[in-house]
Protein backbone atom coordinates (compact mmCIF):
# COMPACT_ATOMS: atom_id res chain seq x y z
CA UNK A 1 0.00 0.00 0.00
CA UNK A 2 1.49 3.33 -1.07
CA UNK A 3 1.85 6.60 0.78
CA UNK A 4 -1.22 8.07 -0.93
CA UNK A 5 -3.48 5.15 0.04
CA UNK A 6 -2.15 5.04 3.62
CA UNK A 7 -2.22 8.71 4.50
CA UNK A 8 -3.52 11.15 1.90
CA UNK A 9 -6.58 9.23 0.67
CA UNK A 10 -8.07 8.74 4.18
CA UNK A 11 -7.59 12.45 4.88
CA UNK A 12 -9.23 13.47 1.60
CA UNK A 13 -12.15 11.08 2.08
CA UNK A 14 -12.67 12.28 5.66
CA UNK A 15 -12.71 15.91 4.50
CA UNK A 16 -15.09 15.15 1.63
CA UNK A 17 -17.44 13.39 4.06
CA UNK A 18 -17.45 16.38 6.39
CA UNK A 19 -18.99 19.07 4.19
CA UNK A 20 -21.97 21.07 5.49
CA UNK A 21 -24.49 19.46 3.08
CA UNK A 22 -23.36 15.97 4.09
CA UNK A 23 -23.41 16.88 7.79
CA UNK A 24 -27.00 18.07 7.31
CA UNK A 25 -27.90 14.73 5.71
CA UNK A 26 -26.37 12.79 8.59
CA UNK A 27 -28.59 14.66 11.04
CA UNK A 28 -31.66 13.33 9.22
CA UNK A 29 -30.70 9.72 9.94
CA UNK A 30 -28.37 9.23 12.90
CA UNK A 31 -30.61 10.51 15.74
CA UNK A 32 -33.17 7.84 14.75
CA UNK A 33 -30.83 4.99 15.73
CA UNK A 34 -31.61 3.13 18.95
CA UNK A 35 -30.48 0.22 21.11
CA UNK A 36 -27.32 -1.59 20.04
CA UNK A 37 -26.10 0.10 16.86
CA UNK A 38 -23.79 -1.40 14.24
CA UNK A 39 -22.27 1.37 12.14
CA UNK A 40 -20.80 0.12 8.87
CA UNK A 41 -17.71 2.00 7.74
CA UNK A 42 -17.61 4.22 10.81
CA UNK A 43 -14.58 5.90 9.25
CA UNK A 44 -13.55 9.16 10.85
CA UNK A 45 -16.38 9.12 13.38
CA UNK A 46 -18.43 11.86 11.75
CA UNK A 47 -21.67 10.33 13.05
CA UNK A 48 -20.70 9.76 16.67
CA UNK A 49 -21.77 13.12 18.09
CA UNK A 50 -25.19 12.81 16.42
CA UNK A 51 -26.36 9.68 18.24
CA UNK A 52 -29.12 10.23 20.79
CA UNK A 53 -27.50 9.08 24.05
CA UNK A 54 -30.94 8.52 25.56
CA UNK A 55 -31.82 5.95 22.90
CA UNK A 56 -28.49 4.29 22.07
CA UNK A 57 -27.12 1.55 24.32
CA UNK A 58 -23.78 1.26 22.52
CA UNK A 59 -22.25 1.67 19.07
CA UNK A 60 -20.25 -1.08 17.36
CA UNK A 61 -18.04 0.79 14.90
CA UNK A 62 -17.02 -1.34 11.93
CA UNK A 63 -14.07 0.07 9.94
CA UNK A 64 -11.32 -1.83 8.07
CA UNK A 65 -8.92 1.08 7.52
CA UNK A 66 -6.48 1.70 10.39
CA UNK A 67 -5.95 5.36 9.50
CA UNK A 68 -9.68 5.99 9.59
CA UNK A 69 -10.01 4.15 12.90
CA UNK A 70 -7.41 6.50 14.38
CA UNK A 71 -9.39 9.48 13.12
CA UNK A 72 -12.57 8.04 14.55
CA UNK A 73 -11.04 7.40 17.97
CA UNK A 74 -9.86 11.00 18.13
CA UNK A 75 -13.33 12.26 17.23
CA UNK A 76 -15.33 9.99 19.58
CA UNK A 77 -17.27 12.05 22.13
CA UNK A 78 -16.81 11.32 25.80
CA UNK A 79 -19.51 9.11 27.24
CA UNK A 80 -20.54 7.31 24.05
CA UNK A 81 -20.23 3.52 24.60
CA UNK A 82 -18.13 2.57 21.61
CA UNK A 83 -16.65 -0.73 20.44
CA UNK A 84 -14.33 -0.81 17.42
CA UNK A 85 -14.10 -3.77 15.02
CA UNK A 86 -11.31 -3.23 12.51
CA UNK A 87 -12.68 -5.35 9.68
CA UNK A 88 -14.83 -5.10 6.58
CA UNK A 89 -18.61 -5.32 6.40
CA UNK A 90 -18.38 -8.51 4.34
CA UNK A 91 -16.85 -10.29 7.35
CA UNK A 92 -18.20 -8.37 10.32
CA UNK A 93 -18.27 -11.27 12.78
CA UNK A 94 -21.14 -9.77 14.79
CA UNK A 95 -23.32 -12.16 16.79
CA UNK A 96 -26.58 -13.10 15.09
CA UNK A 97 -29.67 -11.22 16.29
CA UNK A 98 -27.68 -8.92 18.56
CA UNK A 99 -28.18 -5.53 16.88
CA UNK A 100 -31.18 -3.18 16.94
CA UNK A 101 -30.04 -0.71 14.27
CA UNK A 102 -27.57 -0.95 11.40
CA UNK A 103 -26.33 2.41 10.13
CA UNK A 104 -24.59 3.09 6.83
CA UNK A 105 -23.70 6.60 5.68
CA UNK A 106 -21.57 7.25 2.59
CA UNK A 107 -20.10 3.77 2.85
CA UNK A 108 -21.77 1.45 0.32
CA UNK A 109 -19.88 3.20 -2.48
CA UNK A 110 -16.57 1.72 -1.28
CA UNK A 111 -17.45 -1.82 -0.17
CA UNK A 112 -16.21 -4.22 -2.90
CA UNK A 113 -19.27 -6.50 -2.61
CA UNK A 114 -21.84 -4.17 -1.13
CA UNK A 115 -24.81 -6.43 -1.94
CA UNK A 116 -23.11 -9.44 -0.33
CA UNK A 117 -22.20 -7.41 2.75
CA UNK A 118 -25.73 -6.08 3.17
CA UNK A 119 -27.16 -9.58 2.78
CA UNK A 120 -24.78 -11.02 5.39
CA UNK A 121 -25.49 -8.22 7.86
CA UNK A 122 -29.20 -9.07 7.96
CA UNK A 123 -28.31 -11.92 10.31
CA UNK A 124 -26.98 -9.48 12.91
CA UNK A 125 -30.35 -7.76 13.33
CA UNK A 126 -32.87 -8.58 16.01
CA UNK A 127 -36.32 -9.53 14.63
CA UNK A 128 -37.61 -5.96 14.99
CA UNK A 129 -34.36 -4.29 13.89
CA UNK A 130 -33.86 -1.97 10.94
CA UNK A 131 -31.30 -0.48 8.59
CA UNK A 132 -30.85 3.29 8.42
CA UNK A 133 -29.04 4.48 5.31
CA UNK A 134 -27.85 7.72 3.74
CA UNK A 135 -25.76 7.21 0.62
CA UNK A 136 -24.76 8.82 -2.66
CA UNK A 137 -24.97 7.00 -5.95
CA UNK A 138 -26.30 6.68 -9.47
CA UNK A 139 -28.26 9.74 -10.55
CA UNK A 140 -31.63 9.45 -12.33
CA UNK A 141 -30.74 12.02 -14.99
CA UNK A 142 -29.14 10.73 -18.19
CA UNK A 143 -26.64 13.55 -18.58
CA UNK A 144 -25.45 13.30 -14.97
CA UNK A 145 -25.20 9.51 -15.27
CA UNK A 146 -23.10 9.91 -18.41
CA UNK A 147 -20.65 12.09 -16.52
CA UNK A 148 -20.61 9.71 -13.56
CA UNK A 149 -19.54 6.87 -15.85
CA UNK A 150 -16.85 9.01 -17.47
CA UNK A 151 -15.40 10.25 -14.20
CA UNK A 152 -15.60 7.05 -12.14
CA UNK A 153 -12.44 5.31 -13.48
CA UNK A 154 -10.34 8.31 -12.41
CA UNK A 155 -12.35 9.06 -9.30
CA UNK A 156 -12.22 5.62 -7.69
CA UNK A 157 -8.45 5.35 -7.06
CA UNK A 158 -8.34 8.96 -5.87
CA UNK A 159 -11.31 8.61 -3.51
CA UNK A 160 -10.54 5.41 -1.63
CA UNK A 161 -12.42 3.11 -4.02
CA UNK A 162 -15.61 5.20 -4.11
CA UNK A 163 -18.01 4.22 -6.91
CA UNK A 164 -20.21 6.93 -8.42
CA UNK A 165 -22.57 4.66 -10.34
CA UNK A 166 -24.06 2.34 -7.73
CA UNK A 167 -27.85 2.25 -7.53
CA UNK A 168 -28.38 2.50 -3.78
CA UNK A 169 -31.99 1.35 -3.61
CA UNK A 170 -31.43 -1.50 -6.06
CA UNK A 171 -28.46 -2.76 -4.03
CA UNK A 172 -30.41 -2.72 -0.79
CA UNK A 173 -33.32 -4.57 -2.38
CA UNK A 174 -31.01 -7.10 -4.07
CA UNK A 175 -29.53 -7.91 -0.64
CA UNK A 176 -32.92 -9.00 0.65
CA UNK A 177 -34.07 -5.84 2.38
CA UNK A 178 -37.50 -4.21 2.11
CA UNK A 179 -37.22 -0.43 1.90
CA UNK A 180 -39.82 1.17 4.17
CA UNK A 181 -39.04 4.74 3.21
CA UNK A 182 -36.65 6.56 0.91
CA UNK A 183 -36.06 10.18 -0.01
CA UNK A 184 -33.88 11.48 -2.81
CA UNK A 185 -32.23 14.74 -3.82
CA UNK A 186 -29.12 16.37 -5.24
CA UNK A 187 -27.12 17.95 -2.42
CA UNK A 188 -26.74 21.72 -2.69
CA UNK A 189 -23.23 23.02 -3.15
CA UNK A 190 -22.02 19.61 -4.36
CA UNK A 191 -21.06 18.53 -7.89
CA UNK A 192 -24.03 16.67 -9.31
CA UNK A 193 -21.93 13.67 -10.34
CA UNK A 194 -21.16 13.04 -6.64
CA UNK A 195 -24.17 14.68 -5.04
CA UNK A 196 -27.20 12.48 -5.71
CA UNK A 197 -28.33 11.26 -2.27
CA UNK A 198 -30.78 8.59 -1.14
CA UNK A 199 -31.70 8.15 2.52
CA UNK A 200 -34.26 6.23 4.51
CA UNK A 201 -34.84 2.94 6.33
CA UNK A 202 -35.26 -0.74 5.49
CA UNK A 203 -36.02 -4.06 7.17
CA UNK A 204 -35.18 -7.62 6.17
CA UNK A 205 -37.59 -8.71 3.43
Annotated model-derived regions:
Residues 115-127:
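A short glycine-rich, Lys/Arg-flanked "PGG" loop and its adjoining helix->strand segment in the class I
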Residues 160-176:
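Short alpha-helix
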Residues 16-36, 46-50:
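Conserved alpha-helix/loop element of class I SAM-dependent methyltransferases that forms part
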Residues 38-40, 44-92:
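Class I SAM-dependent methyltransferase SAM/SAH-binding core
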Residues 100-114:
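A short SAM/SAH-binding and catalytic strip from SAM-dependent methyltransferases
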Residues 177, 184-205:
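Core SAM-dependent methyltransferase catalytic element
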Residues 128-136:
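Conserved beta-strand signature within the Rossmann-like core of class I S-adenosyl-L-methionine
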Residues 90-102:
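A short acidic, Gly/Pro-enriched loop at the edge of an enzyme's catalytic core
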Amino acid sequence: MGLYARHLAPWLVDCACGTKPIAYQRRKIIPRASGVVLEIGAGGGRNFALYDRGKVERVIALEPDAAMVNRGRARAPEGLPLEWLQRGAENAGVTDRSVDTIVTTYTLCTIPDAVGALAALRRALKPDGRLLFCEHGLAPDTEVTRWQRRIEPVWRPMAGGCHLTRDVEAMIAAAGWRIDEAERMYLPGTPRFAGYNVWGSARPG
